[in-house]
Design a protein with these regions (language model features):
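12-transmembrane solute porter fold
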Residues: 6, 22, 226-227, 252-289
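Extracytoplasmic
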Residues: 2-37, 41-44, 52-54, 107-108, ...
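Helix-loop-helix hairpins in multi-pass membrane proteins, especially solute transporters
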Residues: 56, 60-197
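Hydrophobic residues within the alpha-helical transmembrane core of Major Facilitator Superfamily
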Residues: 12, 48, 82-83, 98, ...
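Flexible interhelical linker loops that connect adjacent transmembrane helices
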Residues: 175-203, 218-224, 248-262
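Conserved extracellular-gate-facing transmembrane-helix segments in secondary transporters
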Residues: 10-24, 205, 209, 213-217, ...
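C-terminal membrane-cytosol helix-exit motif in multi-pass small-molecule transporters
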Residues: 164-184, 203-215, 234-249
Length: 289
């Protein structure tokens, strides 16, 4: 029961720090004097880092077990959320948000692993996963409420500090209650290895390409700015190399292509890609009037 409460709270906090930040972003932009061209980065860098490192950190959890990756992710998140509240300029805030983005990449896959190991296949397990998913929108709306309340009644800094306090309490509880599965994982997954070529192509490819697309609209010469062209081309080359590595080189790829073999899986992935992309655009621009 304690494990379930911990992972539900973790899911809630993950969405809390996405939705709520967009609410306080206008006030943060004024307080830290963020130039218009950089206002998108404190909001987007968090999700960018999470998405880029999700697969490598998930593989680390496969090798060393979910317990340590999950709990250390919570500790890391608590630290950098607390630091973000003390930001004195927008560069410090962007760095804190970027480093904090590594934490969801750690506990997103491990929460699924922990729940999967705890419950046997069947209706009860399906219900547990359904409830877990339901806490994402709950955390989303809590983030909006707390973000608005702190910006109006306190200061935007308390949005981060309150979140870090809850994260710290969740860290302590997880250390005391979640069973350590490292020894078990080392035995069960003794043959599992890190796909280093996948890491070296997927991570920089996602980061460089997303940076070029995001920053191109605010660069001095738009998408014709030299550094935008260079980063975009490099990102595409890295992603193309990642497709080749994952499909024909890696013995244990981070993203096996057979994941997309089930009927409609490829179409579902494409539709979710565009759905989340459009939602992110709406969420950002809805914060500014």
């Amino acid at each position: 029961m304690a494990l379930y409460a911990i992972v539900l709270l973790t899911c809630t906090l993950q969405e809390f720090f996405i939705s709520g930040f967009n609410i306080i972003l206008p006030e943060v932009s004024k307080a830290l004097e963020i130039p218009p061209g950089y206002q998108i980065w404190p909001a987007s860098i968090f999700s960018l880092v999470t998405g880029a490192f999700l697969l490598p950190i998930g593989r680390i959890a496969d090798i060393h077990g979910a317990y340590w990756v999950f709990t250390l992710g919570l500790v890391w998140f608590s630290i950098w959320t607390f630091v973000a509240g003390f930001s004195v300029n927008y560069k410090m805030l962007i760095v804190a948000r970027a480093l904090g983005g590594l934490a969801p990449a750690a506990f997103m896959p491990t929460t699924i692993m922990l729940i999967g190991k705890t419950y046997r296949p069947g209706p009860r397990k399906n219900m547990v996963f359904g409830i877990y998913s339901a806490f994402a929108p709950i955390g989303f709306f809590i983030g909006i409420i707390i973000g608005g309340a702190t910006s109006q009644m306190l200061t935007w800094r308390w949005y981060f500090w309150l979140g870090s306090i809850v994260l710290f309490l969740n860290c302590v509880t997880s250390f005391l209650t979640i069973p350590n599965d490292r020894a078990e994982a080392r035995v069960e997954n003794a043959a599992v290895r890190m796909d280093y070529w996948g890491v070296l192509t997927i991570v920089p490819g996602l980061v460089l390409f997303t940076f070029a697309i995001t920053d191109g609209a605010h660069a001095p010469r738009g998408f014709q700015t030299p550094y935008i062209i260079v980063t975009c081309v490099l990102g595409i080359l890295f992603l193309a190399a990642a497709v080749y590595v994952e499909g024909w080189v890696a013995a244990q790829p981070l993203l096996p292509f057979d994941l997309f073999q089930p009927k409609y899986m490829g179409r579902l992935a494409v539709s979710l890609f565009f759905a989340y992309g459009v939602f992110g655009i709406f969420l950002f621009y809805a914060s500014f009037q």
